[in-house]
Amino acid sequence: EHHLVADIAWAVIQYWQTTGDESFIAHEGMALLLETAKFWISRAVRVNDRLEIHDVIGPDEYTEHVNNNAYTSYMARYNVQQALNIARQFGCSDDAFIHRAEMFLKELWMPEIQPDGVLPQDDSFMAKPAINLAKYKAAAGKQTILLDYSRAEVNEMQILKQADVVMLNYMLPE
């Protein structure tokens, strides 16, 4: 659940934007943002001419070990963008980081909204079979689906426990 790394970075930016605490962002905040950005840069894998983030578990615990989870990829990009902005604004002299961050932002592949207006949760989600969930909706919040299917089986279906892309739209409305 590496998305937590970007979630913390997002919270740091929110704190700074809300409080205007320049001392915090120039010291502790920048240190945290740089290290979390370095983590994302190291997590990316090259696939042909682009970078991708593989083998992740986004906030939706029913979809595990997937590639290019939309929530994770967008939050990772935001983390690296903000770290780069803060580094430039507060005079970070780590030229190697700046170069790596620029390349990451240029080459990271981002899941795109489909013609039907849907942002796929990950590379495989839309190809998975959908099942009728009416039986389980009456017992909402109880995970009764796990009485009929194993977690591994649920992982291979179009089923959400937490709607990653809905939360993504809240956290990064732009």
Where do the PLM segments sit?
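Phosphate-binding glycine-rich loops and adjacent basic patches that engage nucleotide phosphates
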Residues: E1-H3, E35-V47, V66, Q143-D148, ...
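Aromatic-rich carbohydrate-recognition surfaces in CAZymes
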Residues: E1-V45, T72-S73, V80-A83, A87
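Active-site-adjacent bridging/hinge elements
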Residues: H3-W10, D49-I57, Q143-T144
